[in-house]
């Protein structure tokens, strides 16, 4: 029997507001434990929540960017459960009247575009953070308690773990572009739970789903889903029954492990939050927020193709993160040719960032510096090989490309008399290479060029070297 995989994702995104959703407590990441909290966050008796308007507008902005319908009447509800990181024994969330519904985004997998529906986007408060010491006790930090977040629930439209990865990449990109969150998984500002079930191909009814947690990266989401997909298939093929449960992905064992039997919404005993009135969002407010939405990745991608003449692949890679797209655009604005700027950002820059595990904001390279170096290549002042030395200096120490070239004596040698001597020396030292070339071995030219570049410390002008070399060989 063959099965179809059905996947839905629940993504929690912390909003980048200056204060918490129901109190004036600040929300910086990395503060000393339990220093960014208040009696409201901790649910002391007699205190009342006050809704943060900026959090509402950030949620609206995110929902609009995800093509959601924005509610006119919305409200908050209490989600009741006991856990050490939940001091009130309930969480203020939204149940039956979310702020956004019926959205969608488009993903691209294997060269094909697919629309993934978004069931809802609702606003809620985050919980505290537990740290398990391994010594028989746990520590709880309530700094995160009350931080505003949105939960974005996809439709069960995802059919493969690869599609799930693409969906998360696209969702993160859109949210980052809006500016409502930095979406840093390593800081907990983006978290994902995945629901997965299998059903016989052709069957409309969904199978029993399991929820996956402990997914610390998009790669873990994909791997966890791949392993859970195999586990469920093995259970079903052996005549077993899938239980509705919560499991976690363990990277060490490459397996999903049972955590607990999955709760349903009835277990949370939702009821309307009595300390907050219903929220009315009129058309004027909606349009005011909509006007703040910047150019989103798909729009920018289209512009790069149509106006800058970039290949579709380049445009897709560059617009994946707002940071990279902004850097590229500023580099072009400083005079660099668009395709050359794209090549450097997708090549040397990305390779360096990946190797050093850094972001663009962490390095000294500036758009001015990169543009200056590209212009020196275009003018023939430096070769592509020399440019790599200049690039290393720019990305590690910053500065002006032209100044670096002059100070380090890296100007490309284009003087014909100097190049002629280099060519003559190489030919005199390698007579066999001349014979090899004349006998049809084209690789001999590559060897000779390499010798000349070595002698010039990479500074000889390659096109001129090739031209002079061929002319001199003909004379011998």
Curated annotation (Swiss-Prot):
<dbReference type="Pfam" id="PF02934">
    <property type="entry name" value="GatB_N"/>
</dbReference>
<dbReference type="InterPro" id="IPR042114">
    <property type="entry name" value="GatB_C_1"/>
</dbReference>
<comment type="similarity">
    <text>Belongs to the GatB/GatE family. GatB subfamily.</text>
</comment>
<dbReference type="InterPro" id="IPR018027">
    <property type="entry name" value="Asn/Gln_amidotransferase"/>
</dbReference>
<comment type="subunit">
    <text>Heterotrimer of A, B and C subunits.</text>
</comment>
<keyword id="KW-0547">Nucleotide-binding</keyword>
<comment type="function">
    <text>Allows the formation of correctly charged Asn-tRNA(Asn) or Gln-tRNA(Gln) through the transamidation of misacylated Asp-tRNA(Asn) or Glu-tRNA(Gln) in organisms which lack either or both of asparaginyl-tRNA or glutaminyl-tRNA synthetases. The reaction takes place in the presence of glutamine and ATP through an activated phospho-Asp-tRNA(Asn) or phospho-Glu-tRNA(Gln).</text>
</comment>
<dbReference type="GO" id="GO:0070681">
    <property type="term" value="P:glutaminyl-tRNAGln biosynthesis via transamidation"/>
</dbReference>
<dbReference type="InterPro" id="IPR003789">
    <property type="entry name" value="Asn/Gln_tRNA_amidoTrase-B-like"/>
</dbReference>
<dbReference type="GO" id="GO:0050566">
    <property type="term" value="F:asparaginyl-tRNA synthase (glutamine-hydrolyzing) activity"/>
</dbReference>
<dbReference type="InterPro" id="IPR006075">
    <property type="entry name" value="Asn/Gln-tRNA_Trfase_suB/E_cat"/>
</dbReference>
<dbReference type="InterPro" id="IPR014746">
    <property type="entry name" value="Gln_synth/guanido_kin_cat_dom"/>
</dbReference>
<keyword id="KW-0648">Protein biosynthesis</keyword>
<keyword id="KW-0436">Ligase</keyword>
<protein>
    <recommendedName>
        <fullName>Aspartyl/glutamyl-tRNA(Asn/Gln) amidotransferase subunit B</fullName>
        <ecNumber>6.3.5.-</ecNumber>
    </recommendedName>
</protein>
<dbReference type="GO" id="GO:0006412">
    <property type="term" value="P:translation"/>
</dbReference>
<dbReference type="Pfam" id="PF02637">
    <property type="entry name" value="GatB_Yqey"/>
</dbReference>
<dbReference type="InterPro" id="IPR023168">
    <property type="entry name" value="GatB_Yqey_C_2"/>
</dbReference>
<dbReference type="GO" id="GO:0005524">
    <property type="term" value="F:ATP binding"/>
</dbReference>
<dbReference type="InterPro" id="IPR017959">
    <property type="entry name" value="Asn/Gln-tRNA_amidoTrfase_suB/E"/>
</dbReference>
<dbReference type="InterPro" id="IPR004413">
    <property type="entry name" value="GatB"/>
</dbReference>
<keyword id="KW-0067">ATP-binding</keyword>
<dbReference type="InterPro" id="IPR017958">
    <property type="entry name" value="Gln-tRNA_amidoTrfase_suB_CS"/>
</dbReference>
<dbReference type="GO" id="GO:0050567">
    <property type="term" value="F:glutaminyl-tRNA synthase (glutamine-hydrolyzing) activity"/>
</dbReference>
């Amino acid at each position: 029997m063959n099965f179809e995989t059905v996947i839905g994702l629940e993504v929690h995104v912390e909003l980048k507001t200056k204060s918490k959703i129901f109190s004036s407590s600040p929300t910086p990441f990395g503060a000393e434990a339990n220093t960014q909290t208040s009696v409201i966050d901790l649910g002391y008796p007699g205190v009342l929540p006050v809704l943060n308007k900026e959090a509402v507008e950030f949620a609206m902005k995110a929902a609009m960017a995800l093509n959601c319908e924005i509610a006119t009447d919305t409200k908050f509800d209490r989600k009741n459960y006991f856990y050490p990181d939940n001091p009130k024994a309930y969480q203020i969330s939204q149940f039956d009247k979310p702020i956004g519904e019926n959205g969608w985004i488009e993903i691209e997998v294997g060269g094909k575009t697919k629309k993934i529906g978004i069931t809802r986007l609702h606003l809620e408060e985050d919980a505290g953070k537990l740290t398990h010491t391994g010594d028989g006790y746990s520590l709880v930090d309530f700094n995160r308690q009350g931080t505003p977040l949105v939960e974005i629930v996809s439709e069960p439209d995802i059919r493969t773990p690869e599609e799930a990865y693409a969906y998360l990449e696209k969702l993160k990109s859109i949210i980052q572009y809006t500016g409502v969150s930095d979406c840093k998984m390593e800081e907990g500002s983006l978290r994902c739970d995945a629901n997965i079930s299998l059903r016989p191909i052709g069957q409309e009814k969904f199978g029993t789903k399991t929820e996956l947690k402990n997914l610390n990266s998009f790669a873990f989401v994909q791997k966890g889903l791949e392993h859970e997909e195999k586990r469920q298939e093995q259970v079903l093929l052996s005549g077993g029954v899938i239980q509705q449960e919560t499991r976690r992905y363990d990277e060490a064992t490459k397996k999903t492990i049972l955590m607990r039997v999955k709760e349903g919404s009835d277990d949370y005993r939702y009821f309307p939050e009595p300390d907050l009135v219903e929220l009315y969002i009129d058309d004027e407010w909606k349009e005011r927020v909509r006007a703040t939405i910047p150019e989103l990745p798909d729009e920018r991608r289209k512009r790069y193709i149509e106006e800058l003449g970039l290949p579709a692949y380049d445009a897709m890679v560059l617009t994946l993160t707002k940071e990279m797209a902004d850097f590229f655009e500023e580099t072009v604005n400083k005079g660099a040719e668009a395709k050359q700027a794209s090549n450097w950002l997708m090549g040397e820059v990305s390779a360096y960032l990946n190797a050093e595990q850094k972001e663009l904001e962490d390095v000294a390279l500036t758009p001015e510096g990169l543009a200056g170096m590209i212009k020196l290549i275009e003018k023939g002042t430096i070769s592509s090989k020399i440019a790599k030395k200049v690039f290393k200096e720019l990305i590690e120490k910053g500065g002006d490309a032209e100044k670096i070239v002059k100070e380090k004596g890296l100007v490309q040698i284009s003087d014909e008399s100097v190049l002629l001597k280099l060519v003559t020396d190489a030919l005199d030292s390698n007579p066999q290479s001349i014979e090899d070339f004349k006998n049809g071995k084209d690789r001999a030219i590559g060897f000779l060029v390499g010798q000349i570049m070595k002698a010039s410390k990479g500074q000889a002008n390659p096109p001129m070297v090739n031209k002079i070399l061929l002319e001199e060989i003909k004379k011998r």
